[in-house]
């Protein structure tokens, strides 16, 4: 009996060692350009990049990196591959450039939101994840960390008054595949979806919808709106919008307990009305509302 117990213990220890050895922590640090710490009990290696460059205050209180101003990424073995999860601390003008780097290098962007109210300068938090080889994931995180060290990009702006809106609604409807309504100088298109909550169907009027609101002119327009997506649609919609140079301003949920789970992203775009509509149409084609 003792020999069986001893053999089992040896095999378990060997398996644990193999599992731990799969994480090349030195390589992770090299590729990410950040120092990390191994949680041996969880077999998770976490690298951190404190935002010590930010002089942030909230209601007169000075915040330092330990108060939640540290970008990080945690790596864990997942069978023959690796899983990563992380959170990036970004100024507003860094959000979309950093998001594009993450998406273009194979990471998923899973949430974008604020952690504070009334902070100065304003900061957003972008959560990322991924599953694949250690080399590809650590390299992607390293590129994200590197982009965070660079200056942000000016946020798009335009001098537009909805009172002077002159848009070609027929053109927008043709491009988007859905007709909208003009009210108060805003041409708004709403595309409903359905989900179930508490055993009942909820749809567009209950807020389960994608919408786009245009104002301005054909040559100088602004669009803002919201995409309702299943979890499996989020990444392709994000990539389509960013490739169209449309800004992502939030990614989150509006409900709990719905089936299927519905995620929402809010966006903002400035440019020619036709270009904005075509960018949105590409993103719409990544969704399958019913």
Language-model features, listed with the residues they occupy:
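An N-terminus-focused feature that recognizes amino-terminal "leader" regions
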Residues: 26-86, 95
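Extended intrinsically disordered, low-complexity coil regions enriched in Ser, Thr, Gly, Ala
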Residues: 64-66, 91-118, 201-207, 231-256
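Extended, low-hydrophobicity, polar/charged segments
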Residues: 138-140, 192, 203
